[in-house]
From Swiss-Prot:
Its cofactor is Mg(2+). The keyword DNA-binding does not apply. This is Phosphoglucosamine mutase. GO terms for biological process: carbohydrate metabolic process; peptidoglycan biosynthetic process; UDP-N-acetylglucosamine biosynthetic process. Belongs to the phosphohexose mutase family. Binds 1 Mg(2+) ion per subunit. The gene is glmM. Its EC number is 5.4.2.10. Activated by phosphorylation. NCBIfam families: glmM (TIGR01455).
């Protein structure tokens, strides 16, 4: 049987893989592993439960809360909140753990369940495995006064907003900001906190109806935000995804500013302020080489991790670093948050525009993105990608040709029978030539002929 937990909790089609029964069982299992097994003061364990606004979140949250309370866990029902807000509240309320119901940037029919440990930290693999192992066991069934109670937590969003405002190095008076909330969990708090910070705010994608989350808007569909920024003459635009754990931006001319560029701006700002721990940024192997070049010239070192914000978080925790993230817009400020926070990132980015008096376009020019091409080579034996001699020779030849002007990355998919071939070079013509050549070698050496998908 395959592992139930994926890279970001349990995720799937609501009422397909992710049923109310499974949600309740996961909650009962978590009640033991994260609650009773770790609580020694004789009090009932406490958990924060939050969700994004997709329709299935209503019945799944009800199932989770039933599973927790019937297992002797007191529940703070925080309602609709961004994922990072749920993590913050676990720490702020000194709860034993938290549960977030969201499928992030996925479409409305999907949903997911992820857990946070005490302090709002993501769970390591071994704790997720313990929860999964507990699924096959009889749940705890207290009676009478020992059952858990459910408390509606009406000021959850306000607590989060106050926290965010306290992180700003400068208020945002004089800035006009367009926010695209993806019809998601930040539809209420993101516009409010930007207004409270002093910005003039234009809002799109903030009318969630349970079915329109991520539908043509948000960080995976930047077209509407680009149009709105130019139309309204805004200084910048900020886009979230459905659960607001990521942020992409748009400058005043409608140009995209991705996660790498955002990290470059913020790393340089923190270093200048003397606040970048050990002058190190943590980023994944998928970050553009231009980020490393720009920061190297400024005396900042990049610690590279595997793909996924959980690996960025692990490296940050292990090294005590305070800034990290991904090209996709997951940016983690460990001084203020335990996970990627799109609202926090947008605020910090806008604050740099206000603080420096420079446009976002000018700030983002600190990094020159190298042309990048990725080809997914399908239907191959991905397990041999790292050991095949012919593939290794082709990669070595490509790296020799590129020298310090580019790089090559071969990455087997974690879920499909394919290998991703990524090449960065000084120009797109070179990147395309080398990438297609490597992809052909991978296909020839590791699989049967078929089309290459770019």
């Amino acid at each position: 049987m395959s592992r139930l937990f994926g890279t970001d909790g349990v995720r799937g089609l609501a009422n397909g893989l992710l049923t109310a029964e499974l949600a309740m069982q996961l909650a009962q299992a978590a009640a033991v592993v994260l609650g009773h097994d770790r609580t020694t003061d004789g009090k009932r364990p406490r958990a924060v439960v939050a969700r994004d606004p997709r329709a299935s979140g209503e019945f799944l949250a009800a199932a989770v809360e039933a599973g927790l309370s019937s297992s002797g866990i007191d529940v703070y029902d925080a309602g609709v909140l961004p994922t990072p807000a749920a993590a913050y509240l676990v720490a702020d309320l000194d709860a034993d753990f938290g549960v977030m119901l969201s499928a992030s940037h996925n479409p409305a029919p999907d949903n997911g369940i992820k857990f946070f440990a005490r302090g709002g930290q993501k769970l390591p693999d071994d704790v997720e495995d313990a929860i999964e192992a507990q699924l096959g066991k009889e749940p705890q069934r207290p009676v009478g006064a020992d059952v858990g109670r459910i408390q509606r937590f009406s000021d959850a969003e306000d607590r989060y907003i106050v926290h965010l405002l306290g992180t700003l190095p400068k208020r945002l008076e004089g800035l006009k900001v367009v926010l695209d909330c993806a019809h998601g969990a930040a539809s209420g708090c993101s516009p409010q906190v930007f207004k409270d910070a002093g910005a003039e705010v234009v809002v799109i994608g903030a009318e969630p109806d349970g079915l329109n989350i991520n539908d043509g808007v948000g960080s995976t569909h930047l077209g509407p935000l680009k149009e709105a920024v130019v139309k309204h003459g805004a200084d910048l635009g900020v886009a979230h995804d459905g659960d607001a754990d990521r942020c992409l931006a748009v400058d005043h001319e409608g140009n995209e500013v991705d996660g790498d560029q955002i990290m470059a701006i913020l790393a340089l700002a923190l270093k200048e302020a003397g606040k970048l721990k050990d002058n190190i940024l943590v980023a994944t192997v998928m970050s553009n080489l231009g980020l490393k070049i720009a920061l190297r010239d400024a005396g900042i070192t990049i610690r590279e991790t595997g793909v996924g914000d959980r690996y960025v978080l692990e490296e940050m925790r292990d090294g005590g670093y305070n800034l990290g993230g991904e090209q996709s817009g997951h940016v983690i400020f460990s001084d203020f948050a335990t996970t990627g926070d799109g609202v926090l990132t947008g605020l910090q980015l806008a604050a740099q525009v206000a603080l420096t008096g420079r446009s976002l376009k000018d700030l983002s020019s600190a990094m020159t993105k190298l042309p990048q091409l990725m080809i997914n080579v399908k239907d191959v034996d991905k397990a041999r990608a790292a050991t095949d001699e012919g593939v290794a020779e082709a990669v070595a030849a490509a790296e020799l040709e590129l020298g310090e002007t580019g790089r090559v990355l071969l990455r087997p998919s974690g879920t499909e029978a394919l290998v991703r071939v990524m090449v960065e070079a000084a120009d797109m013509e070179t990147a395309e030539r080398i990438c297609k050549g490597l992809a052909a070698v991978v296909k020839e050496r590791l699989g049967a002929p078929s089309e290459l998908a770019v």
